[in-house]
Amino acid sequence: MILESKGNEKLWSLIFISLMLGFLILVLYLRVVSNKVIYLMLHDSIDLEVYEAMFKVEAEKSIKPYRATYQENFHFVKGQVTYLKGDFQAAKENFEKINLKKVWKRFSTDIFLRLTYGQLLVSIHLQDEPAITFFEEQLSKAPDSKDGKAKLVAQAQAIKDIVFNKEVNDYFDTTEPENKLARIMFSYYGALNAQLKGDEERARSLFESIAHENPELFYVQEAQKYLEGEN
C-alpha cells in the first residue's frame, strides 16, 4: 500500500507539472498573439484610440509583478499617440513621465531605445537644438534591441536633415516601408524632401497619396493643408 501511495504521488506530481507547463505555454502563446494584434492595430489599422485603450487595460489589469513595467510603457504609448497626432509638446511631457527604474530589466533596453528615438523626433519637430544634440548622443549610446537600432538611427537622421537642417536626404525614397503607417510617414517626409529639391510635382503626388488616410495623423493633416493651399 505504501508503494502504491508513493506511486500515486509521483503520478499526480507529473500531472501537475505537465498542467503547469501547458498553462505557461498557453500564456506565452496568448501574449504573442496579443502583441501581434496590438501591433496590427497601430501599424495597419491605424486605430489610435483602440491602440491606446489596449495598453491602458494592460497597465491597469496586469498581474502585480508586471504592473509597474506596463504602467511606464503606457506613458510611452501615450507619448507615441500624441506625437502621431502632432501634439509634440504633449508627447514630450508623456515621454518625460517614464521612470525606467520601474521597468523590468529584461524590457528596459527595448523601452529605452524606443523612448530615446521618440524623444529625438519630438525635439526635431519642436526645433529644440540642445535637446536634439542630447538625444542624438543618447540614441548613439543606446544598446541595440531586436536589431532595430540601425533603422531608428537612420530614420532619425533623415528626419533631422529634412525637418531641422532643411537638407535633402533620400532615405525615405530609397527605403521600403514595412507597414501602412510607415508608408504614410515615408510619403510625408518624402514629399518634404521633394520640396527641398524643388520638385513640387512629386511633392504634390506624395501628399495626394496620403491625404485620405486617418486624419488624426499629423502627416495627413499637413498633406491636406498643402493640397488646400494649392486650390
Question: Which sequence ranges carry the predicted segments?
Answer:
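Long, non-transmembrane cytosolic or organellar matrix-exposed soluble domains/tails
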Residues: T174-N231
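Structural signature of alpha-solenoid helical repeat scaffolds
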Residues: S62, Y66, V103-F107, E178, ...
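N-terminal topogenic membrane-targeting module
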Residues: L26-W104
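"A position-specific structural signal for the A-helix of alpha-solenoid helical repeats
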Residues: N35-L40, Y70-Q80, I111-L121, K149-I159, ...
